[in-house]
A protein has these predicted regions:
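Hydrophobic/proline-rich hinge and linker segments of small-molecule sensing/allosteric domains
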Residues: 1-24, 91-100
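Secondary-structure junction motif
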Residues: 15-39, 104-106
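Thr-Gly-centered strand-to-loop micro-motif
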Residues: 22-23, 45, 68
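Solvent-exposed amphipathic alpha-helical surface segments
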Residues: 39, 80, 118-122
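Short beta-strand-to-loop elements that line the ligand-binding cleft
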Residues: 42-51
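Short acidic active-site motifs
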Residues: 54
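Beta-alpha-beta core module
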Residues: 57-101
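A late-sequence structural motif
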Residues: 85-124
């Protein structure tokens, strides 16, 4: 996971830090809140959504920073790190699961290979 912000807005300099997070039970949300708590960094949840598109929109608009999986962070967003006062995030486990009924489907086989290739390239 990585912290992301908009290159047009220095949101990461604000205190408390405005943060966009996923729903309450999300591992991504827990990782973000845990990281900020370990740093003693004051933060305020300003956007809450289960939608990746919503998280990205909140960051693009300069509303907040967000913790996203590296493979879902669009290249036009800025990856933030220690030089921005943001500490590391806990890794998130990712699994690709397919049903027995999908065995032998060329379309599912292709999608399965593509997902695995994408995750490997992202270092997951």
């Amino acid at each position: 996971m990585v912290w992301v912000g908009s290159p047009q807005f220095d949101v990461w300099q604000r205190s408390p830090l405005p943060v966009a997070v996923y729903e309450e039970a999300s591992p991504g949300r827990r990782s973000a809140i845990h990281s900020l708590s370990l740093q003693g960094r004051p933060y305020k949840v300003v956007y809450n959504s289960a939608s990746l598109a919503g998280q990205i929109a909140a960051v693009e608009s300069g509303l907040a920073v967000a913790a996203l999986t590296q493979c879902s962070a669009p290249p036009h967003l800025q990856v933030l790190g220690p030089e921005h006062g943001l500490g590391p995030l806990e890794p998130m486990q990712v699994a690709v699961v397919r049903s027995r009924a999908s065995q032998g489907s060329k379309a599912v086989d292709s999608l399965h290979r593509l997902l695995l290739q994408t995750l490997r390239q992202a270092g997951l």
